[in-house]
Amino acid sequence: QNPHFIRARPSLIAKARRADLIICSGAGLEVGWLPILVQKSGAAVQPGAVGHLMTSEYVPIIEKPTAIDRSMGDLHPEGNPHIHLNPHNILLIADELAKRLEAINPNNSKIFKERLLDFKTRWQKAITQWEQESNFLKGSAVVVHHKSFSYFIEWLGLNQVGSLEPKPGIPPTSLHLENLLQQLD
């Protein structure tokens, strides 16, 4: 499901009311529905509580605009929230998630620490393998549909030469696509 367009339906609100922890990307990605969900939820998942985890607060954010207006398209004022597309960010998030789980359920602290260590070992091994397998792509020119791939492009060392969207969130026109094709020739 596209996180830009999730709807805070009654079934989701009911689940949030029972939750000990809400995990979101943050950086404004969930701005259209998360405030309603949190407003109708319990104290455990309110902003500032241990059960309210905005993962973007624990990783380096890219593409933070210095100024913003609607003519620039659908930009995220807090920077690019698609942090999960750089696997190194997942390691940073895992550390914070384990801390939160330990705070919520201290009786299982040892298990959380063991599982974090196991996860980080396996994830780092996977990152190393992915980087080796994709090394030949470094510097390759790519065209994206949306700015959501910026972390991925940065991680793999790709070269974004264009975007199907003329501006973030703005559907492409035939003229824009024609110009993009000419640029790529």
What are these model-derived regions, one by one?
Residues 1-185:
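Extracytoplasmic metal-acquisition and chelation regions
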